[in-house]
């Protein structure tokens, strides 16, 4: 993809570009005149990008977040003005099945990324996607940026670690790193293993095809929900 340099608003590297949030963020930044580089796992599908008609406007990079060399190559090659880390193992349930893998993906990879930025793009601005799961068992409603973290899952612990690590690199090394604490947000691009898609797909199947029972997790959980397309505007 060729972009006229004089018209660029910035150069954005989006890690996790093929996910729900990455897709909406890519469209938003492209609309603002950015050159967008998309970091993705090798072999991952671009079906969301095809739906939003941005697949031909993104420069894709296959990045292994467990490999510091892979991250270094991506950052040094693109020299981004802004980096958005939306890549994560996003299933709380899956984090109990593989806590080590979750910590590796959601925490250690962030250290690799911060070190890469410090070495190859110290002037770039980093956005790290944090999660309301970090609050865990809460005593205060609603929560704020100063509410104490009480993580209740490997996923939440990993997210807290990444959140604090970005803070440390900002204060110790002077990197421009910030975290956005995201609460639940959905869209038609959400994967079907998440609760709202489970419910809507299950209802549709039962209405039209007499589908199977809908299996859900904790029915006592209470969450705020937003639209992913709105959330990424806050990120960008």
Where are these regions (language model features)?
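N-terminal Rossmann-like NAD(P)+-binding domain of SDR-like oxidoreductases, especially those catalyzing
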Residues: 1-185
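NAD(P)-dependent short-chain dehydrogenase/reductase
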Residues: 139-142, 164-236
